Structures are given as C-alpha cells and as structure tokens.
Amino acid sequence: GCRLVQYFKCELKEINLKQNIMRDIKFRVWDNELCKYRTEKDGDYSLGILSGQVRGIYGEKFPQMEVEQFTGLKDKNGVEIYEGSILQNPKNEIGIVVWSDAGLKLKCKRRNGDYFIIPLDQGFCNNKIIIGNIHENKDLLK
C-alpha cells in the first residue's frame, strides 16, 4: 500500500484584514505514479508550486502530481486539515474537505447517495477527526 509522508511547506502567510487572521500557506502534493505524498525534497531535485501546478527547479511540469492546500483548520486532535482530508464526526458521518468558489466546504454523502455541502470553520471541526485522505482511503467515501 501507499504511505503518507511529509507535506510541502511554503514560507508564506495569508493575511485576512477583515477578520484579523493570519495563517500559514502550506501544501501537500500527491504523486499518482508513486502512490504517495511527496516531500519538499524528494529524490535529487526540489519541487515547488507555480500557478497551482507542481514544477521542478528548472520549470519542468509534473502532471501526475495533485496539489492540496492546508485549510488553516485542525481536527479535534490538533491534526492539520488539508484539501482532500476525510473527516468523521461523533455520529460516524463522513465527508471530504473540498474548495469551491464559495470557499472551504465538507462534502458529505447521504444514505440515498445524494451529497450535501457544509461550510467549514474551526468551530465546526472541533469535534471531527481526520480518518484518511482521498487518495489512500477512497473506500471510506462509498
């Protein structure tokens, strides 16, 4: 199986002046060919993110890699929540973290197969735990 490894970390901060909030801008990158999350320095080259795409030090593209952004939120155990994280609440309801045009959301599946979307904020995440991610635990979303 695949194993989870380190995340990318950008030395940037997002500042939201309206809410007086500052958060780290971090990413993790999933490599579909190697079936794992890549580290910032994986192998003999460095990777970066430019315009939402993973690039090598000489600008080469890596289309097999998917970029997932840190949400700025943590689950009830203090684990950082990223796009693609799978969360579970105390009622064993499960959803996946997604970005939409309207912001950060949790996409949950009803018993009848329909989906519903819930806006995410730290208050909402305080009783949720991360039980996996979209790449290594797709079976949790069935």
For the regions a language model picked out, list residue spans one by one.
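Secondary-structure transition motif
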Residues: G1-K142
